[in-house]
């Protein structure tokens, strides 16, 4: 299409020239005493056109001649840039391939070439950025080689170049790498400081949050680790199962870190409602409260959501979780001030009637009856639960309780047999 348009334009110019020059009788007379030169107007126009063409070509030739040194310098600069970029690719390729010595050597060669270009008077617009990246690759290789002095030297240089004029992403990448190296060195406080220096936006990225979680756990900052894990779960950086496992472990760690009932209650209040409803967290917190001599009624209040879930079967509790929950309630009932109130009596009785075949609930109901000195009812419930209990510790304690009931009623033969069965379980 373009060629056709050019041909049409050429034909138009030819037609216009033919119409103008074909019937043009004009002439130009040049007086140069004692001479007189007569020239046709068409010839003069052709000569002027040729003159301007020659002048233009001469100007182009002179411009090209004087531009040769500059073009040669640009060509050399492009060749150096190409070599520098190839060396940078070699550094990255060797680094991911595990050839750390070669990667470090290639990254350092990039730095040498950049300095050579700048010493020649040329300025690279991306100079600070490529220098920061090269120092970062060299530091990564030195870190893999356990060369800590070399790593720190390249890290400081990378930070300087990243702060001098590189893009913000480069500086953030350098800080993230430095935080990861600090974690590898087991220096959690330095890692947290570097992550704090990132700022609000970069510090909430998934990679930064993962490192913050690891550093907080390493530094035994359970509250900070718990907050970070919540952010990761909110951003869906962890699967639902993994998030629940991490939150559960951190919540239990926070509970175990309390050394008196006041600290434990403060730690419990720092947990979310969902975390408090986790069966493992609730039972561990209630058990820890009883160990510290806390209020048994408060421990049962903490256990109430897990109890309701177990009874209503809204969530599936494992057999171990059910046993742990019942054991914690039993321990609270056994304390001096832990006698079950009317509310818990109604809950246990209702749960046992709704699930008459559940041996764990029968065991708990029997223990509650013993605490209230209802010996006959307790003996009946414990005997019914004994045949279906699978947990060895519950079976052993059931035999022990039956032995105590037999001694209470004066049946020494039954008590002896029950004690023997408890010892054999």
Language-model segments: residues:
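Transmembrane alpha-helices and immediately adjacent membrane-cytoplasm interface residues
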Residues: 44-75
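Membrane-proximal, non-transmembrane interface segments of integral membrane proteins
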Residues: 71-179, 185-190
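Flexible helix-coil transition and linker loops at the boundaries of alpha-helical arrays
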Residues: 76, 114-128, 161-168, 238-241, ...
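Structural register within alpha-helical repeat arrays
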Residues: 90, 131, 138, 178, ...
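Residue at a conserved register position within TPR or TPR-like alpha-solenoid repeats
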Residues: 94, 135, 142-143, 182, ...
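Structural motif corresponding to the intra-repeat A-B loop/turn of tetratricopeptide repeats
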Residues: 97, 145-146, 185, 219, ...
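Alpha-helical repeat scaffolds
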Residues: 108, 149-160, 187-199, 223-235, ...
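Alpha-helical adaptor scaffolds
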Residues: 146-147, 159, 171-180, 315-391
């Amino acid at each position: 299409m373009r060629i056709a348009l050019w041909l049409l334009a050429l034909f138009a110019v030819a037609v216009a020239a033919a119409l103008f020059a074909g019937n043009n009788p004009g002439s130009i007379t040049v007086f140069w005493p004692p001479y007189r030169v007569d020239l046709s107007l068409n010839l003069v126009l052709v000569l002027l056109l040729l003159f301007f063409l020659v002048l233009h070509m001469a100007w182009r030739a002179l411009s090209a001649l004087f531009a040769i040194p500059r073009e040669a310098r640009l060509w050399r600069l492009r060749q150096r840039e190409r070599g520098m970029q190839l060396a940078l690719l070699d550094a990255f390729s060797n680094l991911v391939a595990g050839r750390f010595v070669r990667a470090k050597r290639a990254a350092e060669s990039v730095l040498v070439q950049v300095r050579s270009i700048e010493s020649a008077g040329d300025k690279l617009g991306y100079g600070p950025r490529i220098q920061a990246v090269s120092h970062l690759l060299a530091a990564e290789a030195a870190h893999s080689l356990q060369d800590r002095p070399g790593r720190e030297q390249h890290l400081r240089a990378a930070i300087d170049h990243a702060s001098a004029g590189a893009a913000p992403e480069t500086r953030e990448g350098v800080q993230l790498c430095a935080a990861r190296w600090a974690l590898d060195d087991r220096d959690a406080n330095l890692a947290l400081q570097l992550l704090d220096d990132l700022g609000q936006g970069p510090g909430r990225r998934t990679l930064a949050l993962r490192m913050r979680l690891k550093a907080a756990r390493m530094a035994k900052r359970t509250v900070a680790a718990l907050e970070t894990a919540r952010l990761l779960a909110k951003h869906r950086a962890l699967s639902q199962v993994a998030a629940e496992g991490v939150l559960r472990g951190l919540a239990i760690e926070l509970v175990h870190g309390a050394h008196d009932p006041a600290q434990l209650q403060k730690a419990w209040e720092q947990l979310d409602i969902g975390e408090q409803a986790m069966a493992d967290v609730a039972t561990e917190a209630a058990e820890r409260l009883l160990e510290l001599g806390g209020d048994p009624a408060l421990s049962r209040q903490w256990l109430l959501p897990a109890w309701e879930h177990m009874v209503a079967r809204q969530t599936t509790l494992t057999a171990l979780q059910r046993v742990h929950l019942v054991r914690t309630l039993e321990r609270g009932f056994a304390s001096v001030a832990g006698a079950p109130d009317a509310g818990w009596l109604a809950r246990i009785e209702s749960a046992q009637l709704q699930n008459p075949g559940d041996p764990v609930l029968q065991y708990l109901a029997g223990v509650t009856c013993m605490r209230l000195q209802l010996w006959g009812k307790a003996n009946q419930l414990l005997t019914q639960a004994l045949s279906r209990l699978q947990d060895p510790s519950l079976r052993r304690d059931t035999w022990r309780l039956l032995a105590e009931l037999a001694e209470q009623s004066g049946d020494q033969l039954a008590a002896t047999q029950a004690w023997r069965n408890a010892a054999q379980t």
